[in-house]
Amino acid sequence: MERDKYIDEQIERHFQEFKKVYPERELFAICLQGSQNYGLDIYTDEYKSDVDTKAIVIPSLEEIVLNKKPISTTHILPNNEHLDIKDIRLYFENFKKQNINFLEILFTDFAYVNAKYKEEWDYLIANRELIAHYNVNQALRCMAGMSMEKKKAMCHPYPTLLDKIEKYGYDGKQLHHIIRMNNFIFAYGEGKTFEECLTYLPNKEDMMKAKLNQYSLEEALQLAEDFDNDTKSLKDKYLKPQDEINKDALEVLNKIQYNTIKKRLREEVI
């Protein structure tokens, strides 16, 4: 099956699953997350990339008035694909934290958007580079932090990774993320757009080799150490003396969040 068609069908499946499990929830958008967004997905007999998504939902009047805890959960589909569901208020806070796993949905080619909120979504996408540079220092720290987390996880026998750890001694998916973070922070620090950073893969073959656990354990550990250390050095090189908050990006986020929730509440009340 042609790749894009397959991904579109999986997004639709996630949407239908969302409606079935959370029929009372008002959806803003469901967006693709993961390897397909940066050109590192694989579809072979040996390895098949999951199609995982993030869903942004809009709170109800009751949730706001009664100050209920905003939803933030992960629903696992029967095929083990993940659907992360998060209140728009929490999701926009994650934009401000500059976590690239949350920012990447602004640049995906695969999303289901609730037609009622298309105007707000289009405005969000029109300002995606602004939002992705809300706090450059924080973005750099986040990239370095992700590299460190992946390095710690690379040989840890998590239940879902136990087979890989027992067979290879490490999880190649974590190693390929360490290399990816190194590419990303270099491109970001050198002034490339966030969109360019997502697909900046000068060593793509090495990353695929890592993802498929084709390095020996000794090689993998050395690569992880070298790339993680270089990422830390690049973070220190590009960090500015003080954090600078992009006020225009903040205004955009506040405006979209306000207008989106207002539209939902107006419809609910009237």
What is each residue range found by the language model?
Residues M1-H14, M207:
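N-terminal regions immediately upstream of nucleotidyltransferase
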Residues H14, K19, P23-R25, A29-L32, ...:
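Conserved NTP-donor binding/palm subdomain of two-metal-ion nucleotidyltransferases/polymerases, i.e.
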Residues E17-K68:
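Active-site nucleotide-donor binding segment shared across nucleotidyl transfer reactions
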Residues I64-H156:
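A basic- and aromatic-enriched beta-loop-alpha substructure that forms the phosphate/nucleotide-
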